[in-house]
Structures are given as C-alpha cells and as structure tokens.
Amino acid sequence: LFEMGYVPNSGGDIGWCLGLSVVSSSKGAGTTYTNLTPSYACSFNTQDQRLKATCANYRWLYDNKQGAVDGVNIQPAKWCRMDLSVNNVESKGTGINFPILRYADVLLLLAEADNEINNGPTAEAKEMLKRVRNRAFANATNKNEMVNEYVDNLNDHDSFKKAIINERAWEFGGECIRKFDLVRWNYYSDAIVNTLEWVRDVTMNYNQLRLEGGEFVYDKTKEIVDMGIAPRLYYNYVNGEIQFENNYFTYRDNSASPYKEATTLADDDIKTAGASFDGLKYIKFLDTYISVSDTDPTTNTKYGTDADGNTIKKGVMNEAFLYSWFGLTDGVVTTGAEDMEPLRKKVTPYILPIPKDNIASSNGVLSNEGYAIRNK
C-alpha cells in the first residue's frame, strides 16, 4: 500500500545493510546488519512459501559464486542487490524501495483488533487471517489443512491472539517491525527467552550434552534424538550456486555415508585459485551455537579425564549469541546453562536508545541508563 521510494545511486540502503549479503559483484556490495534466528526459520511450516522468500543460508561472493552461511548468519532473503536490473550501483544507493504498510498488515491488524474488541474472533477476523495464509500456502499440497482447518480451529481469544503473533512473524520477517509488535503485546522478553531456550535445548541434543553443575558436559552415551531439525545443512554446487541437499527440518546422521565424507568450504577457500567445488559440502546450522572441547577456553587447560579414563569435554555457548540481548540477560545469564525463566518477568530495555551524539550534546541531561548497552 505504501513504500518508501528510492532511485538507483540516489538513496536506499536496502541491499546494502538489509537483505542478502553480497561481498563483491558488478552490482556493488553490501552486508546485512540483521540476521534471523534458527528458531524462527524452523517455526515455519515446510510448505509455507514465505520461508524461502524470508530465510537464506547463503550469500553472494561474486556475480557467479555463492558461499554458505551458518545458523548464526541466516540472511533476510526478501531483498538482494543481485536482482537489480542495472550494474555499477553505489553500495548505499540501491534504489530498492522499502515497505512501510502492506495489505497483509492491514488484514492482520483488523483481525487482531476484532479479536480484542469481541474477546474472541468473529467470522470476519478469521476471514482476514485466511486471506493472508491463502497466499502463503497457495502452492501447498496441504493448503486446506494450513488455511481453512488451521483458522477454523481458533475459537477463543487466546488461541487466536497466539495465531496472530505467529502469523505476523512469518509474514513480516526481516521487515524490522517485529520488536515493536512484541513490545506492544508485552511479549518481548518471553520471545527472547523462547529463542535462547530453543537454541540451547536443540543444540544440546545434537552435541550430546547434558547439564551438570551449571555446565554443558559432553556425554558420548547420550542418544541423539531426531527433533525434525537439521544440525547441519548439506549442499552441492551447481554452476556456482548452492543447492541444498536437506532443509531446516531434515536431520542427517553425520556419522553415516555420504554425510561423514562431506567437507566444509570456507569463503577464503572459495577465493583461492583451483578451489574444488566437487562433492558434498556442509555448513553448521546449529552446531555453531555451542562449541564442544576438552580444553577450558578461559584458562586454556585440559579438563582431564573422568573416573573411567574418558576425556572430559564441555560445551561453551556462542558468546555473540548469548549477549545479543545483554540488556535482558545481564546479571542472570553468563553461560547459557542457567534457568532463564526469571527473565520472562524482566523488562527488555532495547526499545529506542538515544543516539550517543544527542547524549553528548545534552550537558548531562540525557542518558541511556538502564539500557545496559554493551560494546561487544
């Protein structure tokens, strides 16, 4: 309904700091400042066509070569400067418009308001939600189940509101409005805790970790459960582009062929002359979040062996992920192994921090006290 309009070389940061990253190309370069979480990517139904349009585990390295990215760097796929019809575009002047108000937003806002006013969904509210989902599952074999049956089973206020909360996530992924939705629902802290716990629990399973004394301890006897989530994504190269062998929902046993023979291919290796793109490759999707080692990363000393002579290994949660919500987790979470339930009652401070230049020129009147901003 309304977009912020730009023209090439005269404005527009979309494709520069938001969208699929492009390291170098005839159409310029750009690196997204916004990544999506694996818990979000895995929340989609497999046949929801918004998934592929929203989440991508690759980026462009050159005009004709892609590189895979891990679960920490899931790309918002709705915009890409490689889709531009002109070359030699300034990096910060892509001319890609940015949506301000979409028709789907109007439909979902109407459905949400109707549910609140009537303390439950009316037929009109359900119809609005069906319209949005009808497009999302237009080509799905389970379309009737995902549209009509799904919505018709939402018959009370709470279940319909939860459906709206989820639908807005799936519909507007990467469009930079999710935080404000969560704030107005008073659901921001809960959403962060859900993400932290999801990543921790899934990664513990696939890395054979258990909690012991506030630490992640490796247990080789712990059975790996197929949770319908892929700890690794396997792929092949076809004409320089990545073709994934499995999706987010397909577990592959990396101890069995052909997956145990798969190799990694870093971006620096791709840039090397004579690099081989043959054979099955993989990128870590969830393995990245907790690294397992026999050495304490703080003291650089070995953990030693247990009573049976087995090498002791422990896991450490990815610091960048752990501190992504430092304003909420500060003072409560240091390793990721803690009970995070108390965080649900804590207010997340990151709403609209005051720019540092404004603070500096305010003669001490303004501050970001309470934001717990951490330069890390």
Regions found by a protein language model. Give the residues of each.
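Acidic/polar-rich alpha-helix caps and helix-coil junctions
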Residues: 1-12, 49-376
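Hydrophobic-face positions in mid-chain alpha helices that act as interaction patches
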Residues: 1-59
